Amino acid sequence: MSGLPSSFDSKEASVDELPFLEKVKFHCKQQPLVPLGTLLTTGAVALAAQNVRTGNKKKAQVWFRWRVGLQAATLVALVAGSFIYGSSLKEKKSEEEKMREKAKMRELLWIQELERRDQETQYRRKRAELARQKMQENEAAVSRLQKELKDLESHIKNEK
């Protein structure tokens, strides 16, 4: 057994190999509130900039305050998501570790079974070889006895 099957490969290694846009999609799926907060913050900044250009200072100030609040909410979502994702990642790693341990145990049991079968095969070959040798010895003894019998028969015929 050459190693662990591909189903045991960690997903983090495959994330590192993804193209940039695929990484963005992956992380957006992991923490959906962060991109939402980023978009809302960007929208608040755009509306504040538009109100500054038109000269509406009060509305610009309101949108800048919204930007600060949305940015804070985004940071809270980022930290909370990292905490939640980190703990679930640890759980996944422990589950993967259990699966690896189980796979190693299966591999060890399979190797032991193969070794046991190999020993049985060697034992049977040894017994077959001993049986062949015994058969050859018996055949030699039978041929000797047949020769002696013929000699005795010829000796008895000669005496008559």
Curated annotation (Swiss-Prot):
Transmembrane segments: 33-49, 67-89
Any coiled-coil regions, as ranges: 88-160
UniProt function note: Cytochrome c oxidase subunit which plays a role in assembly of respiratory supercomplexes.
Protein name: Respiratory supercomplex factor 1, mitochondrial
Subunit structure: Associates with the respiratory chain complex III/complex IV supercomplex.
Record keywords: Coiled coil, Membrane, Mitochondrion, Transmembrane, Transmembrane helix
Organism: Zygosaccharomyces rouxii (strain ATCC 2623 / CBS 732 / NBRC 1130 / NCYC 568 / NRRL Y-229)
Gene3D superfamilies assigned to the protein according to its UniProt record, in alphabetical order: 6.10.140.1320
UniProt topology in membrane: Multi-pass membrane protein
